[in-house]
Amino acid sequence: MRRQLSLAFSIIVLACLVSLAVVSAENWPQWRGPMLNGISNEKNLPVKWSTEENVTWKLAMPDRSGSTPIIWDNLIFLNVADGTKATGTLSFWAVDRTKGTVLWKKPLGTGDHMMRKQNMSSPSPVTDGKTVWVLTGMGVLRAFDFKGNELWMRDIQKEYGKFGLNWGYGSSPLLYEDSLYVPVLHGMRTDDPSYLLKIDKATGKTIWRHERPTPAQMESPDAYITPAVLKNGNKTEIVLSGGDCVTGHDPATGKELWRAYGLNPQNIQFNRIVNSPIAFDGLIYAGSRGNPYMAVKAGGSGDITNTHIAWTFANGPDVPTPVTDGKYLYLV
């Protein structure tokens, strides 16, 4: 989940992002970029801008959104709430990144509504350069080619039950190799179990669905995170945080490989998690609702709470996901 911004501000931010994209050759295929770490290798990018300075073009958006643009070559893809309260329409836009013109729009569904401060356009799209996938907060997942032709559609809520997050669904799907990973970590407004869903990116078919029980109560099971990919030696794991703990999962089966508690030492019942876990150089960084923030060492098995927590500190971020370059961890 990304906290909603005012409409005017979201237009300015989009213009700045596009301005950076025009001078950058690097694709930005999903939330937090090609390596899922929020870092770009491009140099000499603008560091100052206003409503006029370093802005190549502006594109007015019909409503606010918590999702981020993704970029592939000359295309920008956007998950858009159309602001039509009568129908609550969501749509998917492809934009020419050099001109700021909308190339095509495709409907994603109706029923958009506000859940506290966010609407149903919070999940960011993801692409592999040929296909682009977009998920709405209503659980509709669609695949399109770059010309806007729909390839397949899934309705996750219809298949597996309604999402039960207090602030509405806001996780972005993770694309790793040939699959999409969709986390549904909830509990405040449902008794249904949390789970991680793996979907074949080409066909849209479920490969596996792994339930993820935790002892968290009230709002604490709710998490708005996007999964991280941990590479440790010749092993790869999908990492989740939520429900008072961090877990690592086998990409082939979904099986939970390890679990570390410590994100809610005071057992607060409203400890929902917004900032996503990150994995870098043998460490997994994960936070909760500000306190604590912790680093977990890779390579564990089973309950690793007492053996693999490298460090913790208080006053971590509530919403923003940190960035690391391997030497420093940057938090807002």
Residue ranges and their predicted role:
Residues 22-332:
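Noncatalytic, solvent-exposed loop/strand surfaces
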Residues 8-21:
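Bacterial N-terminal signal peptides
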Residues 1-6:
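Positively charged n-region of N-terminal signal peptides that target proteins for export
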